[in-house]
Amino acid sequence: MSVNFKGNPVDLKGNVLEVGAKAPKVSLKAKDLSVVEIAKEDKVQIVLTVPSLDTPVCASEAREFNQKIAAFKGAEVIVVSMDLPFAMGRFCSTENIDNLVVASDFVAKEFGEKYGVLIANGALEGLLARAVFVIKDGKIAYKELVKEITEMPNFEAVEEFFKGSGSCCGGCGCH
């Protein structure tokens, strides 16, 4: 699988998980170095992957989801990158990001590898491609892999999913 960075193809390590697949459990580091668990069976999680919060597009994406989080009632929104937890904390403080969780995959790159979004070559090698996963009941309920890393994900599609057209089957306020 590949995506583009500024129009040039870059490969991803592994296979991107598809809707219906079991979501692998992964432990990441929060900005305060606590553990963030991905694929909790008792929560609906919206997981956004970005190369780095220190880039304009990634920062805009985090701000946008931070503002629109009310549309995803009952869901936990988590932004995952390879940024160091300290840098993530500084970003959240500077940008007043307080409605979502930031988590780093820098320790083992386990999320990137298991979810198929780890960039394997090119200028961004070792970072994460831009993607959105909704995890419900331990499975991938929604997925968007953004084909051009420098572009934003489709916010409207995620909102529509939670309004019921893609329906996450309840428990998250989408009905």
Predicted segment positions?
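Chalcogenol-based redox active-site neighborhoods
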Residues: 1-175
